[in-house]
């Protein structure tokens, strides 16, 4: 069982990254791959969960132990598999997720893909008492980003990646204005351009 991998990110794709560890490339399914786009010349440490099925072995990656712990809590809920849990964690507001669970906010949880009212209620039932004060603390705090509805999906994903990287909303808004003047690009191209503007 892997705990974490340390290496260089060599591939950033819409649903996964590849981390090169001593010449071996590990494909990791992650919640927001574009957060790893910022500097691919430095080694990163990615926490790992290995999911084993009869026909498939998958590795899921996390930025830190807290994100992994939240993932592990989610997959223990009936009806939530690893990919569903990862889709929930794709929202960078992990504090909001924890608050929704502890405050019995079922409607908040139903906004995630594939999560209906029944599953959302099950998440609250199973996890409300298990989430400790430590897991629901500011460790999950992140930039809250409101993106204009007119922004295309690729740019929206890039802006959310900037928020996940820790950039302030005012800086992201400045970059958004500049990028909206450009022709439409892929998410990774938007992100590269945004990082150039920010740096």
Curated annotation (Swiss-Prot):
Disulphide bond pairs: none
Region listing for Domain I, in residue ranges: 1-63
Gene Ontology cellular component annotations, sorted alphabetically: cytoplasm; Holliday junction helicase complex; Holliday junction resolvase complex
Cross-referenced SUPFAM superfamilies: DNA helicase RuvA subunit, C-terminal domain, Nucleic acid-binding proteins, RuvA domain 2-like
Recorded coiled-coil stretches: none
Span list, region Flexible linker: 143-149
Domain III: annotated segments: 150-199
Pfam families, per database record: HHH_5 (PF14520), RuvA_C (PF07499), RuvA_N (PF01330)
Major location category of this protein: cytoplasm
InterPro entries found in the cross-reference section: DNA_helicase_Holl-junc_RuvA_I, Hlx-hairpin-Hlx_DNA-bd_motif, NA-bd_OB-fold, RuvA, RuvA_2-like, RuvA_C, RuvA_C_sf
Keywords, in A-Z order: Cytoplasm, DNA damage, DNA recombination, DNA repair, DNA-binding
Protein location: Cytoplasm
GO BP terms, alphabetized: DNA recombination; DNA repair
Any GO molecular function: ATP binding
Domain of life assignment: Bacteria
Keyword DNA repair listed: yes
UniProt-annotated stretches for the region Domain II: 64-142
Binding partners and assembly: Homotetramer. Forms an RuvA(8)-RuvB(12)-Holliday junction (HJ) complex. HJ DNA is sandwiched between 2 RuvA tetramers; dsDNA enters through RuvA and exits via RuvB. An RuvB hexamer assembles on each DNA strand where it exits the tetramer. Each RuvB hexamer is contacted by two RuvA subunits (via domain III) on 2 adjacent RuvB subunits; this complex drives branch migration. In the full resolvosome a probable DNA-RuvA(4)-RuvB(12)-RuvC(2) complex forms which resolves the HJ.
Entry function: The RuvA-RuvB-RuvC complex processes Holliday junction (HJ) DNA during genetic recombination and DNA repair, while the RuvA-RuvB complex plays an important role in the rescue of blocked DNA replication forks via replication fork reversal (RFR). RuvA specifically binds to HJ cruciform DNA, conferring on it an open structure. The RuvB hexamer acts as an ATP-dependent pump, pulling dsDNA into and through the RuvAB complex. HJ branch migration allows RuvC to scan DNA until it finds its consensus sequence, where it cleaves and resolves the cruciform DNA.
Membership in a protein family: Belongs to the RuvA family.
This protein's domain notes: Has three domains with a flexible linker between the domains II and III and assumes an 'L' shape. Domain III is highly mobile and contacts RuvB.
Protein name: Holliday junction branch migration complex subunit RuvA
Underlying gene: ruvA
């Amino acid at each position: 069982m892997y705990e974490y991998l340390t290496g260089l990110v060599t591939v950033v794709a819409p649903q996964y990254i590849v981390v090169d560890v001593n010449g071996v490339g590990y494909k990791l399914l992650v919640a927001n791959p574009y957060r790893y786009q910022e500097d691919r010349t430095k080694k990163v440490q990615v926490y790992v969960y290995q999911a084993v099925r009869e026909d498939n072995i998958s590795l899921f990656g996390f930025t830190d132990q807290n994100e992994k712990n939240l993932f592990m809590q989610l997959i223990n809920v009936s009806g939530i598999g690893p990919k569903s849990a990862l889709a929930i964690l794709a929202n960078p507001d992990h504090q909001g997720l924890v608050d929704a669970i502890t405050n019995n906010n079922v409607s908040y949880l139903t906004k995630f893909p594939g999560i209906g009212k029944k599953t959302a209620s099950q998440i609250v039932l199973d996890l409300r008492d298990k989430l400790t004060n430590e897991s629901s603390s500011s460790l999950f705090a992140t930039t809250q980003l409101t993106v204009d509805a007119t922004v295309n999906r690729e740019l929206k994903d890039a802006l959310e990646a900037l928020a996940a990287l820790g950039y302030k909303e005012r800086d992201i808004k400045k970059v958004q204005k500049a990028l909206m003047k450009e022709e439409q690009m892929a998410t990774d191209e938007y992100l590269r351009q945004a990082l150039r503007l920010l740096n």
